[in-house]
Structure formats: C-alpha cells, structure tokens
C-alpha cells in the first residue's frame, strides 16, 4: 500500500468497504524497480510498470484508477480474475453426474466468466507476503451463481526479478463441481496512452 507508486496510483483511491469487506491497492516490486499494482476487488491488475528497450517505463495493462471505476466499469472483466468458470457455458446449464445445473446468465442466454457476480465482482481476502508476492483468498458459497459445492480458492501473484508475473490458482471443494479460472488481462505492450496505440506495430514473440 504505497502512495508513491511508480504507476502514480494511490492506495486511498482504492480503499472502500463493499459488502462488509475492505478493498485496497497492493504494489509488488522486483529488483529492477518494476511494479505490478493489484486491487483485491476482483483480483484486478490495475498497472504493470516495465521499461521498453530505451529504458522508459510504461504501464502495459489496462486497468482502472480507483475502486469506484472498478465496481462500475462498463467492461466488468477488465484485467480481473475470472471464475468460477472462464468463457461461456452454453444456455447457462451443464450436467454433472447425471444432474443438470442451471447457472446465472449474463451473455444472452449463456453464462459468461462466472456470471454477473462472479469472482471479478468479489472482494478477496488479501495478504501481501513480501515485496514480490500477494496471496488472495475467497470462499465461493454452495450454489453461488448456480455452481455445486463450496469452493475455496487461493490465488498467488508472484512478480519475479525476470519481470515475470506468475499467477498460481488453487482450489478445493466439498462436492464435485467444475472450475476453470483465469486472468482476463487487457495488455498494450506499447504502453497505455491517450489514445491507446494499436497492436499493429507490436512484434510479439511466443
């Protein structure tokens, strides 16, 4: 929780109580001075500050500047965690062990990215272990958004000295269920500008 973050974001702008739980801003730093800024509302990435080939730092991920914009975003999955189930489940239903489950729908007749109040819209319990590591925890109740089983999720963000952001997802459940978590990052490798540049001049090596 650093008000002098390289990204310019302020912890105070992310501090609010939502549903009885407090939101905040967490800054991870590595030995290179690079930063990742994360809020525990939806586990959203709000800034990733890294240098270009000339050593100029820029934010390369789309994120919001304050908690109110996160909550009221017209793009609710902007760089957030997604769950219980990333992508669409057709017609908002699935079968498991011979039983059909009906889910909350938010994409026409389909269930998308965990539903209207999926993991992206939840306040996670947060523990910053050190400068490099943030651990988020959330317990998804039985039948939340229509899914069977109580699901306990732990997501660990690790920001390495190689400028790698490692996201580790672990879940335990008390009943057979389906889980397909992901992070819905919106990247712009040329840096977030105004207007934001397109990807047409970006060379990506995989």
What is the predicted function of each stretch?
Residues 2-206:
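An exposed, glycine/acidic-rich loop-and-rim segment of catalytic or binding clefts
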